[in-house]
Amino acid sequence: KIITDDQIAQTVVEEVIWSPSKDGYLKPKIRVKPIKLCGATITFVTVHNELYRRNNGIDVGAVVEIIRSGDVIPKVHNVLTPVEIQPPPEQYNVELKGVDYVLTNPNDDMTVRLKMIHAFFVNTGVAGLGRGNVQRIMNAGFNTVQDILNMSLEDFLTVDGFKDKTANKIRNSIQKCIIKCTLPELLVATNILGR
């Protein structure tokens, strides 16, 4: 596809944001000085992976050209002024594997755990367990899928903001969905086979 001048914009990287995936991959994205591109204001841009970021000198202060892949997802098209790369924050214990940083112990990271638990309940079709409710449940001390599956109605009522209606709805949805879940669906939901 040919990229025309109105489909590309130049801006400056203001921040590299690190977010672990449910599989323990530490993915970089960048916050840029806001720009207009194809009728939208762009603030956040995908960087693909760590190797791409590293090889192209993408960090705070880099001048980059942005396009919208498929006129939707903003991504770095070109780096006009590369800069020295900084490592991820020290809170992340990582190693470079292939093109990505991978957490050395992803099960210890609460963001990874939140995303894994949320994905499990999405893949099993449980209603009412979006990320916000999963976070509330984890804040109440139920930090694994097994913990949540074993929760009683009384346990759900200890969760901040949960009343009878919400607690019953989520508990009933869990019981209904887990009973009808097939083995292949359960394998996908648990992510036991990996990425």
Regions found by a protein language model. Name each.
Residues 1-195:
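RNA/tRNA-interacting regions in translation and RNA-turnover enzymes
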